Amino acid sequence: GESHLHDGRVCQDSSASFSDECGTVAVVSDGHGGCDYVRSQIGSAMACEAAVKNIRRLFENISPEAFLAEPDMMLIQLEAAIINDWNESVRSHYEANPFTEEELDCVSEKAGASYRSGHRIERAYGATLIAAAVTRDYWFGIQIGDGKCAAFDEAGICTQPIPWDEKCFLNKTTSICGSDALRDFRHFYSEK
């Protein structure tokens, strides 16, 4: 955020949250800052919206008992639904707002050729995503990309419960726009 303000660039980060009788959710998404990701500020907002929508749907439609009977399967289905909704949002936005020449002039030659042909346009919207949810019966975190999800227990001890991804190193990260996004998602859950 601060460097974007200093350099006069658009901040590509987004966040969302909600809390109701079912649970509490916090979501953050970091748009990719590279030149080829000219719509990542839009993509990060879409990622947050997709996560909130689908976590809310999970809370409303899946009982705690059903979730806890197969938590890994439930979280993989949640991650798949988020990816699907994000891709649908990207496609709808792109169809209503094709790339401008100004946007295409900013990207690499390779990305420009791809975007002009309508191929892999979702890369322009690329973003990471971290979401954490707490209910009375369980809590979980899901993540794709770099960044850290920190959790504090009642004693104030901090942990990072979502497993780290070795593919996220230095300037490299996995992304919701990746062709292996579902495989690249990772998660954690607990009853405590």
List PLM regions with ranges:
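PP2C/PPM-type serine/threonine phosphatase catalytic domain
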Residues: 1-192
